[in-house]
Amino acid sequence: MDSTLKHLAIIMDGNGRWAKLKNKARAYGHKKGVKTLKDITIWCANHKLECLTLYAFSTENWKRPKSEVDFLMKMLKKYLKDERSTYLDNNIRFRAIGDLEGFSKELRDTILRLENDTRYFKDFTQVLALNYGSKNELSRAFKSLLENPPNHINNIESLENEISHRLDTHDLPEVDLLLRTGGEMRLSNFLLWQSSYAELFFTPILWPDFTPKDLENIISDFYKRVRKFGELKC
């Protein structure tokens, strides 16, 4: 298997704590987090990565106060509209994964419009995980298998391939590097299937403070690791 970094996945954690440290509302941290998201996306697009997946809104985030959820929905819609030119000018393909049926029709239409407008860009894809959770994604894949069973599954490998083809990420490479900012050391139901052989990095840096230079340092560390993919390496 190839050890080149093609697919970077990030759990963007720490917006609320960053705002609290500055005696600001959580919304202030989310706004600053959007700027970091944009900076990191453009850096990745310019440094030959194939894919960047960002955990933007989880299936569990609906449990937050309604006022915060409403703000996040408005901010997401505004970002997708305002940054359209950023995607087009930088040849960035936009993809969304997750159970999008949980969103309003207006927001779904905004998501689909940007996906459609950028669908021909091939070199770099930014993926936003929206109303996403691995358990939800796998459950939807298994439901699809039960409702439309293929007739060619005769071993575990073919079953694994069939499941992979039914995931939201079916057209994306496997995750090579999974990074979480903010100091917590857990995966939070994010890309569990796709990260089977990913290298894991946890940094105490809060997401709004995270910079392309920090990412460069982590990627440098990534290339010092020996990825075995279950094999023995001499």
Curated annotation (Swiss-Prot):
Entry binding sites for Mg(2+): D13, E199
Molecular function via GO: ditrans,polycis-undecaprenyl-diphosphate synthase [(2E,6E)-farnesyl-diphosphate specific] activity; magnesium ion binding
GO cellular component, one term: cytosol
Pfam families named among the record's database cross-references: Prenyltransf
Active site: residue positions: D13, N61
EC number: 2.5.1.-
InterPro entries: UPP_synth-like, UPP_synth-like_CS, UPP_synth-like_sf
PROSITE patterns with a match to the protein in the record: UPP_SYNTHASE
Broad class of enzyme this protein falls into: transferase
Note describing how the cofactor binds: Binds 2 magnesium ions per subunit.
GO biological process: polyprenol biosynthetic process
Needed cofactors: Mg(2+)
Gene3D superfamilies, sorted: Decaprenyl diphosphate synthase-like (3.40.1180.10)
Keywords: Magnesium, Metal-binding, Transferase
Keyword flag Protein biosynthesis: no
Reported function: Catalyzes the condensation of isopentenyl diphosphate (IPP) with allylic pyrophosphates generating different type of terpenoids.
UniProt record similarity statement: Belongs to the UPP synthase family.
Subunit structure: Homodimer.
NCBIfam families: PRK14833.1 (NF011407), uppS (TIGR00055)
Protein name as annotated: Isoprenyl transferase
Organism: Helicobacter pylori (strain J99 / ATCC 700824) (Campylobacter pylori J99)
UniProt lineage: Bacteria, Pseudomonadati, Campylobacterota, Epsilonproteobacteria, Campylobacterales
